[in-house]
């Protein structure tokens, strides 16, 4: 192999590696963006499939483990009451960092509910997702959510990537 051929192969490998990272980030961004429409439409099975089979969802003192518990949350009477009254689980843009077959994402979200002729923000929160690449694509291994109430736990999630910015 000539030196030119070796350099071209290295350059192609670099481009393919960068393309894979971009494709992975896009897949994760799409997964995050799909949560709101799925949960607001009451699509329990599709919502549950966003998680790994052994995935966890911890939000405001509620701990769900596995797809069955996520599905049960979407099918619950409390959730049904939210969505039949008119709701929007809006997920803001996510910061996504990928490391091989695992990734970390942080974003803010709003839960907006219809109140007569108006809409009101019921909840503002921050979420940190640990994701895992599986045979059929990216899934949530753990999702942790905290209310943006000024508390230390929410600020800690918000600051997930702050160390990088300081370096």
Give residue ranges: language-model regions.
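A beta-strand edge to alpha-helix "cap/lid" segment located at domain peripheries
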Residues: 2-16, 80-167
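Short, low-complexity N-terminal intrinsically disordered segments enriched in polar/charged residues
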Residues: 2-37, 41, 45, 49
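Charge-dense, low-complexity intrinsically disordered segments
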Residues: 18, 22, 64, 118
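A solvent-exposed, acidic/Ser-Thr-rich amphipathic alpha-helical stretch
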Residues: 44-110
